[in-house]
Amino acid sequence: MRAFEFDHHLISSYERFSRSFSSIRSEDLRAAIDAQYDAGRFWPDALLSLNPRYLSGPTVDDLVASGDLDEGTGRVFRFGEKPLRFHRHQAESIAKAKSGKSFVVTTGTGSGKSLCFFVPVVDTIIRALRAGKPRTTRAIIVYPMNALANSQMKEIEKFIGQSGLPDALKPVVKRYTGQESQEERQRIAANPPDILLTNYMMAELLLTRQDDLDAQVVKNATGLEFIILDELH
């Protein structure tokens, strides 16, 4: 698309539309209004924005081949048969997480910040399950709003669902945000998910309300390996 041609076409169309409502006979009034149109007083200037091109990094298959990621993780993070290629900041985040270091990711919208933590979390879970360790809540992700938690849950479940991994190795993701029924809360307490998505208000309630279900959910996170604050700002 030719952006400047489109901008000119859009404004011209809008000008014709706005002029079509009246026919001005007075020459001096028409001249004054024409001057306002010519000065662009009825629409804002074009807003130009440059989208950065993020530095490219290895593919998920590259990290599997180097031993940095489990083969099962390589099956999760793909688009069909095509392996996911990481940006450099994503690969650096994966390396930080594998080293056990805390880190903060600050990068642009649409740059794949969620993969910076989901990839090492999923990899840690798959390795633990492959080693025969019992399921326990190894990661808690705290979101500022339920809508974000809901969309992220759909996204990671889509990746896991298309992986073809056996159920014994598939990470289980559950949501504990206050939207769940009592029955669902009971199931989460009785069968700890590998990844628990919550919001900051529910996270506080888990630590302070301490009814029997909440206490069990917290107990299920004994040995927690990841706590992630999304949209920290």
Regions found by a protein language model. Name each.
Residues 201-205, 210-233:
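SF2 helicase catalytic motif II
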